[in-house]
Amino acid sequence: MDADFWLDRWREGKTGFHQDRVTPLLPKYWPRLALPTGARVLVPLAGKSLDMVWLAEQGHEVLGVELSSLAVQQFFAEQGWAPRRWESAYGQHYAANGVELICGDIFKLDDAALKDCLGVYDRAALVALPETMRRAYANHVYGQMPAGYRGLLLTLDYPQTQMEGPPFSVDEAEVQALFGEQAHLWDRRDILEKEPKFAERGVSRLDTLVFRLSAAS
């Protein structure tokens, strides 16, 4: 799986992974992180998620990273926002109303790009990557987050043999292996009845897991 896979999905309109509402678990659990107003929050593999709008409405400065220029342009167009634009070594930047989106590769971000991110919201990134890429992703992104960062990580847990991802199954054991003491399980919910597309593809069990991520300051 490479960048072209996701670029093709956006070009072909195969974006069933996009939600046309704010993820319900976000307003439920995000306040428990107690991030200060104005804190910069990283949203990796952001797509055109409305979760970014919600985070900005809470007073955060949102930094989203997304490969597809189509997704980025649709995000601002659908919000009716006219973004400022500029270019850097990380990619093309678009910014308006507290949301900055970098159209570029998350693996090109370095500690200079992430040093001001006190928070991270990962709903669609870790589960979008195959197992062979998840360790590299976690090391690259979370390994460069500043000391004392706090994050909310949402994953899915289902029998991977019953369905090809994405989204992929990332269970509690793998999250603990990737993040160690930085990860704390807050919640586990059975959501199979709410996700008929999974059942239609033969999935017999589907849980969503909610983790708090934090690094010692």
UniProtKB/Swiss-Prot annotation:
Catalysed reaction, written as an equation: S-adenosyl-L-methionine + a thiopurine = S-adenosyl-L-homocysteine + a thiopurine S-methylether
Where in or outside the cell it occurs: the entry states: Cytoplasm
Q: Name one GO cellular component term.
A: cytoplasm
PROSITE patterns, per the entry = SAM_MT_TPMT (PS51585)
Q: Which GO terms describe its molecular function?
A: thiopurine S-methyltransferase activity
**UniProt: S-adenosyl-L-methionine binding residues:** 10, 45, 66, 123
Q: What class of enzyme is it?
A: transferase
Q: Which Pfam families does the record cross-reference, listed alphabetically?
A: TPMT
Q: Biological process (GO) annotations?
A: methylation; response to metal ion
Keywords, ordered alphabetically: Cytoplasm, Methyltransferase, S-adenosyl-L-methionine, Transferase
Per the UniProt record, which EC number(s) apply here? Answer: 2.1.1.67
Question: Source organism's superkingdom?
Answer: Bacteria
UniProt xrefs under PANTHER family:
THIOPURINE S-METHYLTRANSFERASE
> What is the similarity comment for this entry?
Belongs to the class I-like SAM-binding methyltransferase superfamily. TPMT family.
Which HAMAP family does its entry note? Thiopur_methtran (MF_00812)
**NCBIfam families to which the protein is assigned, alphabetical:** PRK13255.1, TMPT_Se_Te
The protein's name in its UniProt record: Thiopurine S-methyltransferase
Q: Which organism is it from?
A: Bordetella avium (strain 197N)
Q: Which gene encodes it?
A: tpm
